[in-house]
Curated annotation (Swiss-Prot):
Pfam families: DUF1968 (PF09291). Constant region of T cell receptor (TR) alpha chain. Alpha-beta T cell receptors are antigen specific receptors which are essential to the immune response and are present on the cell surface of T lymphocytes. Recognize peptide-major histocompatibility (MH) (pMH) complexes that are displayed by antigen presenting cells (APC), a prerequisite for efficient T cell adaptive immunity against pathogens. Alpha-beta TR is a heterodimer composed of an alpha and beta chain; disulfide-linked. The alpha-beta TR is associated with the transmembrane signaling CD3 coreceptor proteins to form the TR-CD3 (TcR or TCR). The assembly of alpha-beta TR heterodimers with CD3 occurs in the endoplasmic reticulum where a single alpha-beta TR heterodimer associates with one CD3D-CD3E heterodimer, one CD3G-CD3E heterodimer and one CD247 homodimer forming a stable octameric structure. CD3D-CD3E and CD3G-CD3E heterodimers preferentially associate with TR alpha and TR beta chains, respectively. Keywords: Adaptive immunity, Cell membrane, Disulfide bond, Glycoprotein, Immunity, Membrane, Receptor, T cell receptor, Transmembrane, Transmembrane helix. Gene3D superfamilies: Immunoglobulins. InterPro entries: Ig-like_dom_sf (IPR036179), Ig-like_fold (IPR013783), TCR_alpha_C (IPR015370). The chain crosses the membrane at residues 111-131. This is T-cell receptor alpha chain constant. Residues 132-136 are cytoplasmic. Its main location: membrane. It is found in: Cell membrane. It comes from Mus musculus. It comes from the Eukaryota.
Amino acid sequence: IQNPEPAVYQLKDPRSQDSTLCLFTDFDSQINVPKTMESGTFITDKTVLDMKAMDSKSNGAIAWSNQTSFTCQDIFKETNATYPSSDVPCDATLTEKSFETDMNLNFQNLSVMGLRILLLKVAGFNLLMTLRLWSS
């Protein structure tokens, strides 16, 4: 994702209507994240996520509370962030497919391990034969 816009995601616990968590991502490092709002609301300092595969960095902060009146818009209102629709449910079964392992990659890793073991055995055998030749 090139030049992502700052966004705030609100996550709610389906079993408890009191627990709410806000994830604030992709904001500029000059934006000041509020430290505390009220008792019962916890806000982390901003954290830099270094994504070396994409050669980019992303800032993130988390706020959570057990109060029913807690909303993400109140916490991060000065940040000019977008608030994606909360109508889309977070389904863990949809994300599992992207985390499946690749069979070819597993086979290649196994092949490399086998070749390393074979190389170690050959080097050990050569060393043993060389020492035996020197001793006689």
